[in-house]
């Protein structure tokens, strides 16, 4: 549904405008003291309505292309949506503590596996 601009199996769930608003950075530039972690809300990552948004891949420090959005949950679970490459990823694990490189590794391996001309970094 998120990848298809609010439509799932031919049924409109959310308007395209709602999806655009969800993906749009709602926070803007934040001073370093207001940032949640050293990764979240840096100059390349914003926060939309429900997930982190990649505003600039080069500044984000993440392997996700500009325009992608993502979020994680407890024990290392996470998902991401990459509209440019028409790709979604869902990673389910139960790893405590989850401060590992699994997310970066998964993103890197995914994009490395699809190295043909379809991938637009």
Please give the residue ranges for each predicted region.
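Catalytic loop of the DD-peptidase/beta-lactamase superfamily, centered on the K-T-G motif
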Residues: 1-121
